[in-house]
Amino acid sequence: MFKFNEEKGQLKCSFCGKTQEQVRKLVAGPGVYICDECIELCNEIVEEELGTEEEVELKNVPKPHEIRATLNDYVIGQEKAKKSLSVAMYNHYKRINAGGRADDVELSKSNIVMIGPTGSGKTLLAQTMARILNVPFAIADATSLTEAGYVGEDVENILLKLIQAADYDVEKAEKGIIYIDEIDKIARKSENPSITRDVSGEGVQQALLKILEGTVASVPPQGGRKHPHQEFIQIDTTNILFIVGGAFDGIDQSIKRRLGKKVIGFGNDSENRNLTQKEILAAALPEDLQKFGLIPEFIGRLPVMATLEPLDEEALVQILTKPKNALVKQYKKMLQLDDVELDFTEDALVEIAKLAIERKTGARGLRSIIEETMLDIMFEIPSREDIAKVIITAETLTGKRGPTLELKDGTIEHGKEKETA
């Protein structure tokens, strides 16, 4: 109930008791009044409480063992990479909590470079890490970036994607994760500095240096090129975790040559020749990235190196079935919504893995293979209420025969043999 000064006939603030003459403004509510001073005080209390909640949330950074355990739920294999990423992520957010310093020691950022073939899980690892901490996440493609003043995207547009992922909450975006894919495509054409302008190679690496290390960047709110008369969003990149990744095709040869030099003169270098692709990539060093075409200053901003091995047939079969969001589980759930059961035989799963290896697409190509196989049956199922179960076999994958159907009356329709041209 609002207060009324009987002597002067003036309204009072229901919270602090000040009259309308003692404050700048009184806001009326149903039976109450509140002054501008009390409104300001309430705002401060709310902001302080929200700030405390956010601080508590960031301080509950999971330990490396916990991070790796969650990564295991979504990513098959790549144990060494998962361990490296878990430690880097833990150290990065521990550094944020310490304000970038521990006593008189300044703590450097733990930006990450991931080396691995297409479809080995680089993007999935980065996405899962962001999901673990519930921080904004953005993916950018390095091939679309060019130096300022040339046709293409400015590096600041990467930051805009992160700001958009944080619903334009800049403070939240400043603690997010950015994954830059295809980073190997901006390697300069040779190890020696070029006299001519390389607008999508060394020039982009130079442009990325500042935001990787930490700077206050000016980002155009609508993207595109900067114009002198537009307003900019200011974002501090000091606490943004940058992860870059690429296939780095051919880097294994550079590593082999380096390893080969160590055994020259000792008689037998057969050990070097017999190294597996996994062992070769695991031996990668910053100097190999420099030989590939990344400039030393750029490599220096990426202190954590994680190598991912090519996925073999067994790993691809596990990827199809084991993770929480495995593709086979997704398609089973999709058909379940039409009251139809879906089953992939063991040989069908192996065939899917073989096709992905043949196409050199790794895990990335698994979905398109299943989609091609399932297209006809997913087209038919909504119109056929008699189907109870669909069985996909290896012959279905190779295109020799259609899927086997179990009908609700108990009869079985074997997939028709397809004619070969």
From Swiss-Prot:
Q: What NCBIfam families does this protein map onto?
A: clpX, PRK05342.1
Keyword Transcription on entry = no
Sites where the protein binds ATP: 117-124
Q: Which cysteines are joined by disulfide bonds?
A: none
Q: Fill in the subunit field for this protein.
A: Component of the ClpX-ClpP complex. Forms a hexameric ring that, in the presence of ATP, binds to fourteen ClpP subunits assembled into a disk-like structure with a central cavity, resembling the structure of eukaryotic proteasomes.
Which GO terms of the cellular component aspect does the record hold? HslUV protease complex
The record ties this protein, via Gene3D superfamilies, to: 1.10.8.60, ClpX chaperone, C4-type zinc finger domain (6.20.220.10), P-loop containing nucleotide triphosphate hydrolases (3.40.50.300)
Protein's UniProt name? ATP-dependent Clp protease ATP-binding subunit ClpX
Tell me the residue numbers annotated for binding Zn(2+).
13, 16, 35, 38
Highest taxon in the source lineage: Bacteria
The UniProt family comment states: Belongs to the ClpX chaperone family.
Q: Kindly give the Pfam families that the UniProt entry links to this protein.
A: AAA_2 (PF07724), ClpB_D2-small (PF10431), zf-C4_ClpX (PF06689)
Q: Where is the ClpX-type ZB domain?
A: 1-54
- GO molecular function (one): ATP hydrolysis activity
Alphabetically list the UniProt keywords. Answer: ATP-binding, Chaperone, Metal-binding, Nucleotide-binding, Zinc
Q: Where is the signal peptide?
A: none
A Gene Ontology biological process annotation?
proteolysis involved in protein catabolic process
- PANTHER family associated with the record: ATP-DEPENDENT CLP PROTEASE ATP-BINDING SUBUNIT CLPX-LIKE, MITOCHONDRIAL, ATP-DEPENDENT CLP PROTEASE ATP-BINDING SUBUNIT CLPX-LIKE, MITOCHONDRIAL-RELATED
Write out the function statement from the record.
ATP-dependent specificity component of the Clp protease. It directs the protease to specific substrates. Can perform chaperone functions in the absence of ClpP.
